Amino acid sequence: KFVIQIFAALFLPLCNLMISDLNGLFGIHQIPIWAGYVLTVVLILVIVNAINLIDGIDGLSSGLCILILTAYAVLLSKNHAIASLNTAIVGSLIVFWFFNVFGKVGGLKIFMGDAGSLFLGYVCAYMSIKSLMRPIAPVDCGEEQMMISITLLLIPVLDVVRVALQRR
């Protein structure tokens, strides 16, 4: 499964969707192309697996993705196609979340599984990279744009770090 994730992660940099500027994070702006490829692939793998690993509790992964993708829809609202895609995914996630959390009562419980959580992780990673590529926010965030994008995915990523350190 991890090998397939690596191939999927390589797809974005090969389509020139990669991080090429850290927007002043740690005082670094422009980075070499090879570093952008590596950073992009690592970021995608971390985000995809972070979303996948938090899918064990009913409503957690879908609820966080609703919040994350709604924020990216606002952040990327100048690009109407991206904002519409986010809105459509959020709309379907709200319905999924309802049946995932409250479906036990009526016997209509559904679950996401690996395919759903990996897809959501990839979408979140794509939106994160897209938001870091250039100033496309409704209000130009400048150097804060990197921190906004990182903050949106902080909970799932820190959970992965916590689990990795706990299992040592």
Where in the sequence are the language-model features?
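Intramembrane alpha-helical segments
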Residues: 1-81, 91-103
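Alpha-helical transmembrane segments
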Residues: 61-168
